[in-house]
């Protein structure tokens, strides 16, 4: 076998030397050094100083990222590693992706699956299937259908999917015609994944569905109450120990049960899995001790039932592979390690790894060493804390102690129980044991109808989930009114809940409010209002439960304190999303009243409704939370859901264990989850609320116990990750204990990897992939800089991290592959790949030149001919709309970067006493086209001077101007008005003539029909023009086109850059001024003023040239205005 076997003594060393893995070691690069590299190659496209750093090839944004990037999905190094490791060419049968939440496990699994699918497509018959099993299978399908780069849908189909999604959302109903069209389209795409006749290779199952379909209980089995779990059980559930023979004989027991007619194994599924691929997401769910199920049994069976060479390959995924108990490591390793590779060829049993006495468990001596050995080559570990992509996690509160021991890792918001809560807690005795139906006492207690007044001595509340609904439902109306309690009418999805003023921070004086019943929820409400007053930011509130003190009561608490749900109308007590003031008292003049709103997600809400609420919460339009400020979620949000730009997370109850708490943190701390926010706001503050008593309290005791158990799990995690296959590439080094890991160092470091091995890289097609990667890098570089020499381009391509998202070691690129990439992009004129650069269709051309060949990004004209255009990349081409835009309506639809009304008012102010000609160079094309149409259609008053300027420069035309052209005059002769009435204007390509002001219809004619020559000869000194830079217009100059000779291609690089006049050297500025005849003492004039003189001189000369006889046909060109087309030089070699 070309790849090393797992039992090789130097397995990781051999693996690390292979180029397909070694190249994924991301080289360390200093940020300042990287910026220097960007500027050295003239490819800085954003950030401070980008115009200078990029030499102004294209307009740049000083607030944007400085790095060129590759459009679309790019697999990161960890994803590439596991794709290369677990594929049909390697011998490795099972792999666990132990990656933190939000790092792209699903994409990695899909990338692996794609490799197997490509392999299976070569089978003539009986091709295996790829099974995706897990609670989050729908999310994996969604990723497959929204990422054309993965190869399952086209870009056109993704665009259509987005269009249908938008239309369906606008309909506001899940049953509308638009929604049905969307569902039909999605179903068609999904069938492509699963229908073999359409090229599908996938089967998608939930864990429960998979287990049920694999093991069919017969009628005889039902009569005997047969349970598959009975064949695979723990002999002593209380002690969590296993019978010696339970696991080892499980497959045999299934066969016996099948022979006895109690069960039927689905042979169709088994045959589909033979030699196939099994992907199991959130694998910790299948063997969790606290939630008994047969999910893990089904997976274990399909992995053990086949001979080793026929068993399906497997990819397991989890950020927290062991959750409920450290002894789950036995179940995990039995799934992860093939049976024949376990000690003695038998499944592991718990007594092999653990000593247990009562409820106390500890690792046996040498048990962790066994975990290390068994997991070598079977685990990928990723803990990514790169603050460039992840928001900072901030814990509010402080560390607490329980029984004189400080609880590790976590900070808490300490919430002392109210006196009423403490009195209620006393009812459970001095050392209370909180049963599962009494968990509400951790959060709050409810008013008790046993007492007419809850404030009377010895009164206590309700908290038991069995007793509370009955007691409150039977309470009298008078008692309910007296205590501010309102029973919410039960429904199928919400059998019982209450509301009322007892949940308010400010109840009527005769009613005890929220502070009386819950110290925790009172603190939560105070914190919410404080956050709103501080400024913007979305809030996620988590509670593990739905009923009693869970998310349903949280919903009522918010509503009782002035926070609305998604649909309710504001009332006088509704709070403002900006200042938290109630509407009746809202006196702020600096902002309008916007109601605070929340939404809720839990398992009893229809999935379609949940998806719509989540989409609205995550929408870019809701970045500040002014549409939906708060989302309340139950345990349904713990896995699979992603939340964008959440600034505050409030955790109101501990999930089942600490690993699941980490999952909850991971819902809001995700890669790129905060990229739309300003850098200063890319953080999440976590509020972990805990109810306490003077001696600590039962909830704090629960946290203490779970953290103690978690330390044992962390010891196992460290052993599991010790020899991770990608430790040397991910370079995860942890120096001190942290929530996600104990101290850890990779067993191999980049420094001791060794010499590069190429045999598998060349044999298995990785060279072809390198060519594709280099091609994408080349394209990105041309999008930043349009002209390169061969050596410059190769140096840039081989510079690490120059392209955003490409973090592989470019220094390992082969120059032969670089040459192949160039050939693939520009081998000949007919074979050149078409690219979109700066919204223009281009191709990369090879141009022979001396001393070194050039590669140029040439724009394609309408005939798809390459054009080497001097100004293509810096000219702001904005054609006018093909319909009239009235000024009043333009404000609603303008696509300019500054509203027309703002520019219009500025124009009226600035040009009262200034030369009107200056308007042509102070405003963008979009302003002028809108103004011209307004002058023609709306007949704006008081604009005579502006009209005269437009006419002087032959931009606007009156009836009188058209009369010399009889055939054209017929088009506008019927338009009302005298000879001086404006009827048309010139654009880059045509003259637009009004045919009906009422209908706003236009007729277009070529420019030459009015004797306008777009290719007038340029003067021999200098050419001026204005370039749009954000909201500003910059005056630029360049040499005349005739200076550029077709055989002097190297000059194109200089001309393509353009030149802001002020950046030119003083000597050059003075020379130009002298040639233009500007006679002043130039030595005492600043560069800015000198450039203004040059600009105005060129504009004056342009006007004079146009007004000479036949000036628009033969006049000399001095200045290109907003509606002038820049010249091109077509390269014909």
Curated annotation (Swiss-Prot):
ATP binds at residues 99-106. It catalyses: ATP + H2O = ADP + phosphate + H(+). Its EC number is 3.6.4.13. This is Early transcription factor large subunit homolog. Keywords: ATP-binding, DNA-binding, Helicase, Hydrolase, Late protein, Nucleotide-binding, Transcription, Transcription regulation, Virion. Belongs to the DEAD box helicase family. DEAH subfamily. SUPFAM superfamilies: P-loop containing nucleoside triphosphate hydrolases. It is found in: Virion. Residues 52-352 form the Helicase ATP-binding domain. Induction: Expressed in the late phase of the viral replicative cycle. PROSITE patterns: HELICASE_ATP_BIND_1, HELICASE_CTER. A motif (DEAH box) lies at residues 281-284.
């Amino acid at each position: 076998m070309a790849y090393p076997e797992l039992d090789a003594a130097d397995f990781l060393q051999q693996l690390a030397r292979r180029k397909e893995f070694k190249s994924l070691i991301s080289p360390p690069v200093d940020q300042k050094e990287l910026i220097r590299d960007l500027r050295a190659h003239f490819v800085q496209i954003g950030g401070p100083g980008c115009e200078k750093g990029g030499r102004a090839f294209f307009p740049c944004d000083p607030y944007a990222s400085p790095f060129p990037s590759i459009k679309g999905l790019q697999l990161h190094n960890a994803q590439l590693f596991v794709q290369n490791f677990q594929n049909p060419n390697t011998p490795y049968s099972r792999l666990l992706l132990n990656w933190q939440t939000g790092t792209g496990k699903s994409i990695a699994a899909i990338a692996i699956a794609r490799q197997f699918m490509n392999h299976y497509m070569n089978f003539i018959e009986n091709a295996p299937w790829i099974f995706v099993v897990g609670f989050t299978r729908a999310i994996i399908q969604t990723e497959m259908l929204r990422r054309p780069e993965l190869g399952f849908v086209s870009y056109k189909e993704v665009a259509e999917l987005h269009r249908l999604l938008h239309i369906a959302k606008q309909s506001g109903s899940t049953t509308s015609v638009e929604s049905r069209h969307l569902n039909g389209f999605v179903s068609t795409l999904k069938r492509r994944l699963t229908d073999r006749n359409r090229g599908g290779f996938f089967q998608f199952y939930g864990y429960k569905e998979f287990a049920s379909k694999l093991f069919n209980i017969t009628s005889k089995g039902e009569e005997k109450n047969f349970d598959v779990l009975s064949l695979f059980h723990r002999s002593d559930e209380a002690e969590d120990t296993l019978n010696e023979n339970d696991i080892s004989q499980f497959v045999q027991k299934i066969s016996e049960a099948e022979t006895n007619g109690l069960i039927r194994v689905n042979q169709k599924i088994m045959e589909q899995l033979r030699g196939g691929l099994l992907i199991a997401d959130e694998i910790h769910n299948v063997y969790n001790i606290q939630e008994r199920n047969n999910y893990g049994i089904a997976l274990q069976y399909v992995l053990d039932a086949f001979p080793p060479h026929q068993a399906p390959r497997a990819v397991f995924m989890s950020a927290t592979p062991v959750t409920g108990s450290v002894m789950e490591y036995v179940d995990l390793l039995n799934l992860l390690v093939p049976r024949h590779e376990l000690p003695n060829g038998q499944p592991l049993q718990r007594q092999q790894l653990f000593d247990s006495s009562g409820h106390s468990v500890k690792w046996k001596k040498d048990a962790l060493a066994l975990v290390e050995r068994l997991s070598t080559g079977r685990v990928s570990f990723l803990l990514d804390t790169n603050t460039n992509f992840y928001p900072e996690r901030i814990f509010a509160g402080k560390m607490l102690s329980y029984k004189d021991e400080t609880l590790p890792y976590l900070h808490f918001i300490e919430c002392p129980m109210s006196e009423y809560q403490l009195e209620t807690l006393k009812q459970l005795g001095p050392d209370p044991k909180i049963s599962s139906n009494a968990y509400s006492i951790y959060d709050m207690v409810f008013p008790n109808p046993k007492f007419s007044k809850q404030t009377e001595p010895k009164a206590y509340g309700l908290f038991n989930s069995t007793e509370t609904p009955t007691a409150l439902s039977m309470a009298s109306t008078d008692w309910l009114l007296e205590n501010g309690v309102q029973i919410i009418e039960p429904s199928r999805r919400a059998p019982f809940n209450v509301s009322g003023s007892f949940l308010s921070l400010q109840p009527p004086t005769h009613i005890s409010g929220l502070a009386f019943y819950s110290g925790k929820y009172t603190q939560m409400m105070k914190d919410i209002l404080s956050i709103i007053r501080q400024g913007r930011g979305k809030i996620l509130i988590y509670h593990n439960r739905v009923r009693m003190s869970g998310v349903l009561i949280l919903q009522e608490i918010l509503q009782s304190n002035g926070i609305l749900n998604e649909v309710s109308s504001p009332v006088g007590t509704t709070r403002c999303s900006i200042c938290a003031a109630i509407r009746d008292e809202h006196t702020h003049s600096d902002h309008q009243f916007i109601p605070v709103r929340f939404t809720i997600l839990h398992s009893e809400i229809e999935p379609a409704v949940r998806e719509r609420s989540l989409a609205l919460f995550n929408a870019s339009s809701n970045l500040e939370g002014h549409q939906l400020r708060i989302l309340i979620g139950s345990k349904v949000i713990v896995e699979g859901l992603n939340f964008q730009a959440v600034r505050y997370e409030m955790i109101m109850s501990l999930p089942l264990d600490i690993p699941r708490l980490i999952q909850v943190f991971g819902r809001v701390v995700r890669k790129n989850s905060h990229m739309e926010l300003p850098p200063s706001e890319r953080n999440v503050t976590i509020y972990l609320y805990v109810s306490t008593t003077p001696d600590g309290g039962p909830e704090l005791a629960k946290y203490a116990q779970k953290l103690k158990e978690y330390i044992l799990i962390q010891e196992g995690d460290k052993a599991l990750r010790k020899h991770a296959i990608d430790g040397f590439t991910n370079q995860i080094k942890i120096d001190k204990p942290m929530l996600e890991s104990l101290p850890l160092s990779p067993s191999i470091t980049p420094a001791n990897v060794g010499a590069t091995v190429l045999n598998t890289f060349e044999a298995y097609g990785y060279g072809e992939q390198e060519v594709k990667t280099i091609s994408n890098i080349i394209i990105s570089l041309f999008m930043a800089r349009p002209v390169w020499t061969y050596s410059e381009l190769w140096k840039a391509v081989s510079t690490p991290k120059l392209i955003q998202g490409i973090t592989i070691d470019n220094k390992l690129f082969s120059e032969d592959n670089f040459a192949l990439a160039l050939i693939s992009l520009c081998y000949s004129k007919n074979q050149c790949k078409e690219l979109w650069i700066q919204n223009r269709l281009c191709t990369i051309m090879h141009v022979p030149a001396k001393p070194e060949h050039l590669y140029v990004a040439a724009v394609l004209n309408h005939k798809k001919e390459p054009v080497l255009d001097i100004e293509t990349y810096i000219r702001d081409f904005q054609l006018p709309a093909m319909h009239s835009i009235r000024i009043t309506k333009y404000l609603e639809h303008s696509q300019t970067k500054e509203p027309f009304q703002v520019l219009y008012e500025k124009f009226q102010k600035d040009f009262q006493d200034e030369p009107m000609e200056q308007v042509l160079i102070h405003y963008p094309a979009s302003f002028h086209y809108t103004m011209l149409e307004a002058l023609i259609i709306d007949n704006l008053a008081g604009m005579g001077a502006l009209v005269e300027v437009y006419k002087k420069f032959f931009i606007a035309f009156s009836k009188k101007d058209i009369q010399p052209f009889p055939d054209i005059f017929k088009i506008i002769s019927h338009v009302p008005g005298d000879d001086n009435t404006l009827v048309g204007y010139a654009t880059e390509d045509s003259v637009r003539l009004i045919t009906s002001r009422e209908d706003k219809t236009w007729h277009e004619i070529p420019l030459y029909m009015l004797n306008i020559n777009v290719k007038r000869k340029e003067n021999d000194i200098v050419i001026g023009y204005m370039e749009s830079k954000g909201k500003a217009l910059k005056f630029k100059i360049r040499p005349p086109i005739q200076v550029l000779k077709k055989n002097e291609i190297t000059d194109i690089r200089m001309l393509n850059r353009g030149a802001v006049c002020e950046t030119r050297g003083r000597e050059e500025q003075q020379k130009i001024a002298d040639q233009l005849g500007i006679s002043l003492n130039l030595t005492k004039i600043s560069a800015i003023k000198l450039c203004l003189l040059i600009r105005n001189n060129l504009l004056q000369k342009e006007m004079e040239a146009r007004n000479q006889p036949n000036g628009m046909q033969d006049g000399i060109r001095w200045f290109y205005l907003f509606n002038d087309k820049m010249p091109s030089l077509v390269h014909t070699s």
